[in-house]
């Protein structure tokens, strides 16, 4: 069986069948992971907070999920809030304004110059913030401009991981999401919360989470979802 498998692969390359298959590979890859995602959703419908199935799609639905997490899991305990993909600050400002513990710290990471690579129908440079970091008078907040690959390692060298971490992933891209999760893996503690803003994109955030948990044997348990799992929150177990 192994010999036949190896021979089939060799013949595939020898005949250069990629010329025929490659134009359709993106479609079939997306379809394959959409199926895996559908299976995952069917196995995780009974969550403490969930609006599935809802025909009313609105980004404001994430605010209900945020409030649920803030009330039921965080309970005004001090947190280290790390957001990756701050953009114009909608989520970042919500947490800054609704979580009032004076000992909490808020860290926002973004290029502020748009996507570093193409993402679906969005092109490199889309969703930029005019290359300007956000502004706030709240001294608990700090911002870090650049690729996560450039800013996160240096940040972690002096990061004091003494509080519950709330990690907000709005990186969109598979590469950015996987890099961030793998870099933060040694710092994750039981009880930490990780939110994903685009979890239902099969070959990006969903695939990154799947590969991360399977490679690092980290148990992430879903605790809430909104907008039909587009926004999904996990707790580290």
What do these predicted ranges mean?
Residues 1-2:
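Short, small-residue-biased leader/transition segments that mark boundaries at the very start
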Residues 5-82, 87-93:
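Class I SAM-dependent methyltransferase Rossmann-like catalytic core
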Residues 40-52, 73-237:
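S-adenosylmethionine/decaboxylated-SAM
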């Amino acid at each position: 069986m192994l010999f036949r498998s190896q021979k089939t692969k060799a013949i595939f390359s020898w005949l250069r069948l990629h010329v025929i298959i490659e134009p359709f590979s993106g479609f079939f890859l997306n379809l394959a992971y959409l199926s895996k995602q559908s299976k995952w959703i069917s196995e995780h419908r009974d969550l403490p907070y969930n609006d599935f199935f809802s025909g009313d799609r609105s980004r404001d639905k994430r605010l209900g999920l945020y409030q649920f997490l803030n009330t039921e899991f965080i309970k005004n305990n001090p947190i280290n809030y790390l957001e990756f993909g701050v953009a114009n600050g909608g989520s970042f400002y919500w947490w800054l304004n609704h979580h009032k513990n004076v000992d909490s710290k808020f860290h926002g990471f973004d290029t502020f110059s748009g996507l570093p690579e193409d993402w679906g129908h969005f092109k490199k440079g889309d969703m930029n913030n005019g290359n300007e970091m956000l502004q706030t008078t709240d001294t608990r907040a700090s911002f870090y401009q650049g690729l996560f690959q450039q800013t996160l390692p240096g940040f972690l060298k002096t990061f004091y991981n003494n509080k519950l971490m709330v990690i907000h992933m709005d990186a969109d891209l598979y590469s950015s999401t996987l890099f961030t999760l793998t870099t933060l893996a040694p710092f994750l503690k039981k009880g930490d919360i990780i939110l994903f803003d685009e979890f239902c994109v099969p070959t990006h955030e969903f695939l990154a989470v799947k590969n991360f948990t399977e490679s690092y044997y980290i148990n992430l348990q879903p605790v809430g979802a909104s907008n039909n799992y587009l926004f999904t929150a996990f707790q580290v177990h």
